[in-house]
């Protein structure tokens, strides 16, 4: 076979024109608008990549037309294939999407354009899912879960599209898989069969609509080992195995996996006192089984080879993970951490290329995301940010505005921020997208007044929460965005990911150096990773910037047309994070609020107690909050709020009294026994 040297200029121009044609047609059908010149440039570079095979990362912003381009590129490619154009012989496509529903949707779209296409044109490879049954691929309505699928033994097997897709996968011109399936096949070393179409000498183009895990990470914990045993136990009923055979494998895991794990758990400690033999955990460092007995290594090797060969049916997900880590420990050093539960980390080097395939990854935040920092890939141009003239970032810098998980546990925080939310909704028009921590998402709607609640975009009956809105376009009517929290990972996770993804930065040597410095004097202190390993802080800032940008772009900014001003509210972000976000939204207005809002100050005061009782300020504020606006004699107020005369006098003299009255639009009138609280004719803003 003559080596492929790339498309000619004429061929690339022709293909690019067909992609542009389909982009225009798709935009016409759904009323969308995209930057055609930008996508023409991206198309040209992708086609050039068929020759050099250098992996490409496209940082097209959210809402810029990524999904439209992917569909248009596939339509143009399928048109070539159906017309028997020689261009279609130099590539095929492996499409990796997050959701099965999206795969099925693209298949339907292509079928609408090419009604009589062969079944091998587009194949969405999938197991049983609710989506596959909804699409009519599974004909057995009695099956309601993946575990119930009997595959070839099902009475509907002959007409099952799910099984048929598996049979057609190798022949498919466009083969679609979910990201979860791709990761599973990759970890199981079973990916090679998908990288090339049968009877096509050239490898597939791999298109990912979102970032995937470039470095498969394996974690060995006590939970992993327990899960391995439980999953083996379930095989007895799932695969009708004899208990004796499963018990034999569980016994092997005790000897070959649990025992070395427990040994390392014990050895990753420092003795504090020779007399009492008291010990303390080493927070993090390196461990290994290289010096283990050769007989143990050999027994483990036999077990590993058995699971990879004749015993593959017993290789459950948790057992596979445990075996991967132990195998690495016998071959060299691994990172361990005790910042949480004892964890041993096994990971491959980050990889974005597979075989000779051209890889194209779409990721709107790739330019800021730390996972790309040391990745060997070409970063394509970003699309121009849209609607920046409409955007205003409101950044509250006061320490009282801290919205970390720990800070939000304070009793006054949630009521205070709900009051601030109501104030924002009074000042600005439009719907609000608020995202927060999962445990707060259900509480916020309960604390808002009905008018404010009616303008809050909910996910069911709760607010959206971090990690629960991935890929969602459901909030693109919002013109107000409130980020009540930060989607931080655990310190242990940041340490692990920096270790894996920033290996070329020197982080691994820093960790090894720190390992040698642990002593009885410092090992008992809570480790300050940001001080000991500054690179972990840099990685964390990049991660947060990428995640927050994703959340901000769920509003009207992602739309082709943005008629309203967009206001985004951030609370006490770290300075480095604030700076990175500012660079990502160049052209937007930025307002830094240095003072603590009055409603937050009041919420703090309301929560204060003295000798177990509410303070005078809190009691008077509570009375004002339920006041019916009718003129009320002071004597009645003091009686109802249980405030003594002397306490009232002290409150009157305090600097907080006048602002509290102003907040509720109240004033004091009269003298002596005729003093009243009345509503002002004009309230303060």
Which stretches of residues belong to each language-model region?
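ASCE RecA-like P-loop NTPase motor cores
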Residues: 1-685
């Amino acid at each position: 076979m003559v080596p492929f040297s790339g498309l000619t200029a004429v061929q690339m121009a022709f293909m690019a024109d067909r992609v542009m044609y389909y982009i225009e047609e798709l935009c016409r059908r759904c009323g969308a608008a995209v930057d055609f010149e930008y996508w023409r440039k991206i198309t040209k570079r992708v086609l050039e990549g068929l020759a050099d095979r250098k992996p490409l990362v496209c940082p097209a912003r959210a809402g810029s037309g990524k999904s439209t381009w992917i569909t248009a590129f596939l339509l143009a490619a399928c048109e070539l294939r159906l017309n028997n154009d020689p261009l279609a012989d130099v590539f095929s496509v492996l499409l990796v999407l997050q959701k099965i529903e999206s795969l099925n949707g693209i298949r339907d779209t292509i079928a609408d354009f090419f009604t009589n296409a062969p079944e091998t044109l587009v194949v969405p490879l999938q197991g049983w899912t609710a989506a596959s049954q909804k699409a009519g691929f599974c004909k057995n309505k009695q099956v309601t879960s993946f575990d119930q699928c009997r595959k070839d033994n099902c009475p509907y097997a002959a007409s099952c599209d799910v099984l048929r897709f598996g049979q057609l996968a190798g022949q498919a011109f466009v083969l679609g898989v979910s990201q979860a399936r791709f990761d599973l096949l990759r970890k199981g070393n079973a990916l090679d069969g998908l990288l090339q179409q049968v009877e096509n000498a050239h490898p597939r183009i791999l298109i990912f609509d979102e970032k995937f895990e470039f470095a498969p990470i394996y974690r060995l914990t006590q939970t992993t080992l327990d899960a391995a045993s439980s999953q083996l136990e379930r095989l007895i009923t799932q695969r009708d195995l004899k208990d004796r055979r499963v018990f034999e494998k569980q016994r092997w895991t005790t000897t070959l996996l649990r025992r070395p794990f427990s040994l390392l758990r014990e050895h990753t400690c420092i003795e504090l006192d020779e007399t009492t033999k008291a010990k303390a955990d080493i927070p993090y460092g390196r461990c290994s089984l290289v010096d283990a007995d050769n007989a143990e290594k050999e027994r483990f090797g036999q077990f590993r080879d058995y699971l990879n060969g004749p015993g593959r049916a017993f290789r459950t997900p948790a057992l596979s993970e445990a075996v991967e880590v132990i195998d690495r420990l016998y071959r060299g050093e691994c990172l361990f951490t005790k910042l949480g539960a004892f964890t041993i980390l096994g990971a491959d080097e980050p990889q974005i290329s597979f075989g000779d395939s051209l890889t194209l990854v779409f990721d709107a935040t790739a330019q800021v995301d730390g996972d790309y920092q040391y990745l060997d890939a070409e970063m394509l141009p970003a699309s121009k940010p849209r609607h920046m003239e409409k955007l205003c970032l409101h950044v509250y810098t006061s320490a009282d505005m801290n919205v970390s998980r720990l800070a939000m546990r304070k009793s006054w925080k949630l009521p205070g921020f709900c009051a601030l939310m109501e104030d924002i909704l009074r000042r600005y028009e439009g719907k609000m997208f608020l995202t927060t921590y999962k445990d707060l998402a259900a509480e916020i709607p309960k604390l808002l007044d009905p008018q404010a609640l009616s303008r809050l975009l909910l996910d069911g009956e709760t607010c959206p929460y971090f990690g629960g809105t991935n890929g969602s376009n459901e909030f693109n009517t919002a013109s107000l965005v409130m980020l009540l929290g930060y989607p931080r990972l655990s310190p242990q996770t940041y340490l692990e990911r920096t270790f894996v993804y920033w290996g070329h930065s020197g982080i691994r040597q820093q960790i090894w150096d720190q390992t040698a410095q642990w002593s009885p004097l410092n090992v008992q202190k809570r480790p300050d990773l940001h001080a000991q390993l500054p690179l972990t802080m840099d990685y964390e800032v990049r991660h947060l910037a990428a995640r927050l940008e994703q959340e901000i772009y769920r509003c009207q900014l992602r739309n082709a047309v943005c008629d309203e001003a967009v206001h985004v509210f951030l609370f006490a972000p770290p300075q480095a994070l604030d700076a990175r976000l500012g660079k990502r939204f160049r052209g937007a207005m930025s307002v830094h609020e240095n003072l603590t809002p009055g409603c937050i100050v009041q919420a703090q005061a309301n929560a204060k107690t003295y000798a177990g009782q509410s303070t005078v300020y809190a009691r008077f504020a509570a009375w004002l909050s339920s006041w019916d606006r009718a003129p009320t004699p002071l004597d009645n107020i003091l009686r109802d709020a249980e405030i003594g005369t002397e306490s009232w006098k002290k409150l009157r003299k305090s600097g907080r009294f006048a602002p509290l009255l102003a907040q509720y639009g109240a004033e004091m009138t009269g003298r002596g026994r005729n003093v009243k609280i009345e509503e002002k004719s004009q309230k303060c803003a």
